[in-house]
């Protein structure tokens, strides 16, 4: 009997890539592969890549250079590149690294079985099309194996915003939303397999406009309310959002929907109106702050996170100070900051660049402010009672680890709860990146 071939997938970048890697794995497992934890043990290696910054793309080429040596020990090893680098660079990947056998873009994952068949015939395989068929509907049904208690579920893909710094519209395409019934079917399937929390994913998820059973388009808020009715699903989150698509019904859902968690990732990128205009964000710092105020009126305890780019072309010290002022005004529980990375083909790539040393210095300053806010908010949690979804054992005997409604990592000592339980606890200590808690009687 022939031993099954082994598959190793390494995932870079966003949560949607994590979801996509799961679906690619399922497609290939259905063709007889089994997953392995190490590249050295694999018969096929897939790198699911991110192209949002230059550094991320170069990491992929560095990893390909390392992995090609494995072919000397296993001549039948197949090496593939998926994701946004694959979409953006296509056959250039094979030219730059001839050891690569397969290149597949994000819209063609459902074609992996056919591409794998070409590999078995001795050919290379390349597919970076935007095919007319829906990849979500073409992918094989998910296996019924038990899942971790938290799961991602892609409901929307692509972006029509065309921010001046971003490659997503070029690598993921125009905005597409999955039909409500398909999302609900997948959510129920996940719940049957042990999932208690689902995070809805999209490059611009609050622009969701999937068709409902009545044929009419539904908003993200309407989808969330439909998910709220699924027995066994206890928590709902969504990411990533654009301020311009934060409509009234979604703000009201944060106020009223019992299963929608009090956490919102709402990137703004800059606090300078001048830079926001150059970024093509189509909102101002003031409109963003007024939106935050409206959200907090409905849900005062909501924890906010954001994204910031420093060193965007033509950014001055005054522009940067405006960003610091906005961060101070919002008080983020989490925020992610990045130095601007030139992406070929985007409008910002042609503009005057900020001195790299100055951009590095600004990045350090913004990260110091973000860290202080995060630690202050974590410290404010001490003494509060929260609910923790238990996800895994901790490092110490009797310790379990999970996350609160606010997405804080929480360690619970002397805990008899099982993975998947939702446990009331009291926070007793704020650590650097997590909280410590005790169970409530």
UniProtKB/Swiss-Prot annotation:
Q: Which residue range or ranges hold the MTTase N-terminal domain? A: 5-121
Top-rank EC class of the record's enzyme:
transferase
- Segments forming domain Radical SAM core: 145-380
Known catalytic reactions: N(6)-dimethylallyladenosine(37) in tRNA + (sulfur carrier)-SH + AH2 + 2 S-adenosyl-L-methionine = 2-methylsulfanyl-N(6)-dimethylallyladenosine(37) in tRNA + (sulfur carrier)-H + 5'-deoxyadenosine + L-methionine + A + S-adenosyl-L-homocysteine + 2 H(+)
Stored InterPro entries:
Elp3/MiaA/NifB-like_rSAM, Methylthiotransferase, Methylthiotransferase_CS, Methylthiotransferase_N, Methylthiotransferase_N_sf, MiaB_methiolase, rSAM, rSAM_horseshoe
Offer a single GO CC term for the protein. Answer: cytosol
| Entry-linked CDD domains | Radical_SAM
Q: Which keywords does this Swiss-Prot/TrEMBL entry list?
A: 4Fe-4S, Cytoplasm, Iron, Iron-sulfur, Metal-binding, S-adenosyl-L-methionine, Transferase, tRNA processing
Residues at which [4Fe-4S] cluster 1 binds: 14, 50, 84
Q: Where is the TRAM domain?
A: 379-441
* Pfam families on file: Radical_SAM, TRAM, UPF0004
Q: Which SUPFAM superfamilies match?
A: Radical SAM enzymes
Subcellular localization(s) per the UniProt record: Cytoplasm
Drop me one GO molecular function for this one: metal ion binding
What binding details are noted for the cofactor? Binds 2 [4Fe-4S] clusters. One cluster is coordinated with 3 cysteines and an exchangeable S-adenosyl-L-methionine.
Q: What does this protein do?
A: Catalyzes the methylthiolation of N6-(dimethylallyl)adenosine (i(6)A), leading to the formation of 2-methylthio-N6-(dimethylallyl)adenosine (ms(2)i(6)A) at position 37 in tRNAs that read codons beginning with uridine.
Listed under subunit, the entry gives: Monomer.
Q: Give the protein's recorded name.
A: tRNA-2-methylthio-N(6)-dimethylallyladenosine synthase
Q: Which gene encodes it?
A: miaB
